Regions:
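Cytosolic juxtamembrane helix and N-cap/initiation of the first transmembrane helix
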Residues: 2-30, 48-52, 117-124, 143-164, ...
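C-terminal interaction modules of eukaryotic adaptor/scaffold proteins
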Residues: 243, 252-293
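Juxtamembrane membrane-interface segments at transmembrane-helix boundaries in membrane proteins
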Residues: 8-19, 41-55, 83-86, 111-122, ...
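Signature of small four-pass
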Residues: 23-37, 41, 53-110, 127, ...
Length: 293
């Protein structure tokens, strides 16, 4: 009996070690790459651009949170935290990949345009490599049997992370002067904010293992919210371009000017609308067409 009980435990320990060692090496690489990226950009100098601030925040956030994950796992403290650790690490890796993808595109194309500037080019390259490292982490985690366990590790959970991320890109691209002049644009900002708050709330409740305290079934709540979000974003897709570009053509001397931010918001609004439509279809299918086994 003793040998039969110990063997599965030993097998699980070996399996966990097989997974955790490559992940630890991968996370060390992620820390190094993101640290190099923000160090190189910081050494160049400060910029007042909101896109520069977003890129710096992305590199710093990913670097220090990945380092915190490593410390907690090496100290074996992750199991003692009152959170869903697998949900947390999976959703963070997904979010980090999205943030670094945005930073890898925004920084070389918007923040600087100096092909001969070695430090900026090197920062862009290391940012791209860090993005690839986080993508590998997401793939490795989801490929392991039994790793896709929590809500944030499922397709609807990852869509919630994507929706929150796209909303962040929208927020940093807003032009306050234009928004404050038109109630229609203010409605769009309210749509972005309300949908973002709910998605963020779902993520926080999931990581904090507090979804069980919800008096209503989670699946039905998600369906209701997703349908509402689709309707609100559908209005924003129409209203935003109408008021943002009415009597507001692109300036002739516009090179990375605020007008470009209006285009980014329009595009990202369409992206989030598609994400919420997919999320709604998936949620409706789970609630009404998939019978629990």
């Amino acid at each position: 009996l003793g040998s039969r009980n110990l063997e599965p435990c030993g097998a699980r320990s070996i399996a966990m070690a097989t997974v955790s060692v490559p992940l630890s090496v991968l996370r060390l690489l992620e820390v190094a790459l993101t640290c190099v990226s923000f160090s190189l950009v910081a050494s160049v100098g400060h910029s007042s651009s909101s896109y520069w601030a977003w890129c710096m925040f992305s590199w710093c956030f990913c670097c220090f949170l990945t380092l915190l994950i490593l410390v907690l796992e090496f100290a074996r403290l992750s199991a003692r935290l009152p959170i869903s650790w697998d949900d947390f690490t999976t959703s963070f890796a997904m979010l980090a990949a999205l943030m670094l993808l945005a930073a890898s595109i925004i920084y070389p194309s918007v923040v600087f345009s100096c092909p001969g500037c070695a430090r900026q080019v090197a920062a862009s390259v290391t940012s791209c490599l860090a993005f690839l490292a986080y993508c590998v982490e997401v793939g490795v985690t989801r490929a392991q049997p039994g790793q896709v366990s929590g809500f944030l590790s499922t397709v609807p959970g990852l869509l919630k992370v994507l929706e929150a991320f796209v909303a962040c890109i929208i927020f940093i691209s807003l032009e306050p002067a234009r928004v404050s002049a038109f109630p229609g644009l203010q409605w769009c900002v309210a749509v972005y904010a309300l949908a973002f708050i709910f998605s963020l709330l779902i993520i926080i409740l999931t990581v904090g293992r507090l979804l069980g305290a919800c008096p209503c079934p989670l699946e039905q709540v998600l369906v209701a919210f997703n349908v509402l979000a689709v309707l609100m974003y559908a209005t924003a897709v129409i209203v935003w371009p109408v008021y943002a570009f009415r009597n507001n053509p692109r300036p002739s001397n516009c090179r990375h000017c605020p007008w470009d931010g209006l285009v980014v918001v329009s595009f990202m609004t369409c992206v989030n609308l598609l994400a919420y439509i997919v999320d709604t279809v998936y949620s409706v299918r789970l609630v009404f067409f998939v019978t629990p086994s």
